[in-house]
Amino acid sequence: GLLRRTHGGAVANDRLLVETPYRAKRHEHVRQKQAIAGAAVDLIKPGESVILDAGSTTYFIATLLKSRPPDGLTVVTSDICILYELADCPSITLIGTGGTVQQGVYAMIGSHVESFLRTIRADRAFIGAHAIDMETGLMSPNPEKASIKALLCAAASNTHLVVDSSKFGIGSL
């Protein structure tokens, strides 16, 4: 088959699902990602703790949060670019998950991230996906990232999937 089920989603058995480098993803579907970011930021209330998954859509959420941060906001992320974007924003308490940096993708992965995520609770998590299949669910080309996404969801009281239209139908070839 094209996919192999894992805890929290599915991963590709072959090369159909290949992770696009972060720098390229940030320039794809920009208008959709900006609209998604606006809707996401509107959900965040002052004093909340928010988890931002690693990815280009969540990066757009971070850039918008930087320009209009709610009072008392705490952001947790495994994304190096989001950490850098929010690092000089004094009104946001910023927490990085630690872990091993995935080259070209700038996501922190590994057992350090998983251990950390098991110890926290947040009001909201904004989760991206490489692909979505209506039967299988969220898909990732990387089993470690699939596991981390499941832990991100478990750590939050409210989970919001933030994906643009390009994520649908990738695994159906």
Map each language-model feature to its residues.
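HTH-adjacent hinge/linker in prokaryotic transcriptional regulators
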Residues: 1-51, 63-70, 87-91
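Conserved phosphate- and dinucleotide-binding cores of soluble alpha/beta proteins
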Residues: 5, 80-173
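Short, well-ordered alpha-helical scaffold segments within catalytic/effector domains
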Residues: 33-41, 58-59, 114, 146
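Gly/Ser/Thr-rich loops at beta-strand to alpha-helix junctions
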Residues: 50, 56-59
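Short, well-ordered coil/turn residues at beta-beta hairpins
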Residues: 53-54, 128
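Short beta-strand element of Class I
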Residues: 72-76, 94
